[in-house]
Regions:
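Membrane-embedded alpha-helical bundles of multi-pass transporters/translocases
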Residues: 1-177
Length: 177
């Protein structure tokens, strides 16, 4: 582990790792909620996302309270992820039903290519961490260096794959002020 060295017990490191894993599964939902809510706000509708969020928070609390005695602390990040995905899906359904949002062919094509590039990068990262497993496990002094190297290589890999499959072009990368 990267952060265990005496600051946390082995059990605390494992538990933190599990919690981060389940919170990470909710990251796309958190981003989608922000995006989808903006469509409502742009149409002067702040109530719909608010009520959906209230229901999602209630769902989060109910799941957490009910399952905590059976599963323990890990239900909190799981419930947060479940309720966030629920929130984003309900917002999306409302947007579609109100004709406020529609996928076009360009978006769908690029989205699928970006998903492919992301999955490929994840697999490449898994390969790199397996390749550097001994260095990551035994050489504390170099652990940050190996991790930094893995991240840099993955970013380069992601951009190369993305350009190769035409997930985006150079015009998409330019910042517009």
């Amino acid at each position: 582990s990267l952060f265990g060295y005496g600051a946390f017990s082995n059990e605390a490191v494992i538990n933190s790792s599990k919690a981060l894993y389940y919170f990470a599964l909710g990251l796309p939902a958190f981003a989608l909620i922000k995006i989808f809510s903006s469509f409502f706000f742009a149409n002067h509708d702040t109530k719909t996302p608010f009520y959906i969020s209230l229901f999602s928070v209630a769902l989060n609390i109910l799941i957490s309270l009910y399952y905590f005695r059976y599963i323990g602390f890990i239900i909190i990040p799981i419930a947060t992820t479940i309720s966030s995905w629920f929130n984003s899906i309900v917002l999306f359904i409302y947007l579609i039903n109100r004709s406020l949002f529609r996928f076009n062919n360009t978006f769908t094509s690029k989205f699928l290519k970006i998903i492919f590039a992301s999955i490929s990068m994840g697999l490449f990262f898994k390969f790199l961490t397996s390749f550097f497993e001994n260095q990551l496990a035994y050489y504390y002094e170099y652990k940050i260096l190996f991790l930094f190297l893995c991240v840099i290589l993955c970013v380069v890999f992601y951009f190369l794959i993305s350009i190769l499959i035409k997930a985006f072009n150079s015009k998409d990368l330019k910042l517009k002020y």
